[in-house]
Amino acid sequence: MIKRSVQLLILGMIGLASSVLNSAGNTDELSDFEHSFNTIQESSTPEEPFQPLKAGDYDQAYDYYIQGYYLKAFREALRRAEKNDPFAQTLLARIYMEGCAVPVDGARAALWFERAAKQGEPQAQLRYGLMLFDGNFVKQNQELGEQFIRKSVNAGVKEAYFYYGQLLLYKASQEKQTLPGVSSQSRENEAIEQALKWHLKGAALGDAEAAFAAAKILSLGTLNRPKDERNARKLLEVAAQNNHLKAQLHLAQWLIQGRGGEKDFDRAFHLLLHNATHMVAPAQISLARLYRDGIGTKGDTIMAAAWYLLAKEAKMQAPDLEIMLQGMDNTQREKAQKEAIKLLPVF
């Protein structure tokens, strides 16, 4: 009996051990099963090191920016800028300058432009160089500013050609004031020639400011180059097509006068009308004269007066149009005032 009890005890212990082993196996399986439902998994591989963008890479922050999602653009740019991405630093500086999503802060913009510029980002080099040259938000250092601007020119930034040309003209004018004489006049003439060269390069890349600046130099001529109104008009066309306001106003006058090419009253009228409807007072004055004289449109004194009244609201006056107003009777003036109200933009 005792022998049988011992055998049962041994068998029971063996069964318990087997049960424990099976239970342990089941526990491991259960643990694996539960782990498979855990949505927060432990990372199997370490996080990849941050890689700044290269030229041509897709830029999520800039994509947000051009779509108008400025806060998202700011956050994404800040995340990358803090990790020393020069493209993100440049965009962040731009956002601070424009006040998109955050208050305008020129000092912070200068800080980020500086960081990006020192890493060789061409757009930042231009903007930081201009800040240094003018002393805006940073201590003025024209020599260092010129170096950064020249670097952006060498990198092919199209806007940089205009600024570098203007920089040369500025330096020559300053030298003329401090050291008047034949030598300074000679250097000024040389600076104009050099500025024209840089402006023409910028114009060839489609920069409106460079095209307009080159047009002005060509319309006057230089010491070594006679005035060239035909090519000046072509450059005005380039600038005007790129929405350069002054170029559009100048081109309209040239089209009326026939400078640099044939007269085109109809085109001049529509150029001025486009800007006048956007409340550009000089365009309103010029358009008033076209209505008064019947150039490019049917003569209409009432409409001429209406456009001039709008220009007067912007504190601009023209003696010849004042005489026109004085020659109108009360009925005509009332009609002109009503037409002027109709011309106001609706927001």
Task: Describe the role of every protein-language-model region.
Residues 50-53, 57, 68-69, 82-86, ...:
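Short helix-capping/linker turns of helical repeat alpha-solenoids
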Residues 196, 203-282:
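Eukaryotic tandem repeat interaction scaffolds
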Residues 57-63, 91-98, 127-134, 165-176, ...:
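Hydrophobic face of amphipathic alpha-helices that form TPR/SEL1-like repeat modules
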Residues 31-37, 46, 312-347:
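Terminal, low-structured helical/coil segments at or just beyond the last alpha-helical repeat
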Residues 150, 298-316, 341-345:
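TPR/TPR-like (Sel1-like) alpha-helical repeat modules
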Residues 20-83, 87-90:
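N-terminal leader/linker segments that initiate helical-solenoid repeat arrays
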Residues 67-72, 103-112, 139-148, 174-198, ...:
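Structural signature of tandem alpha-helical TPR/SEL1-like repeats
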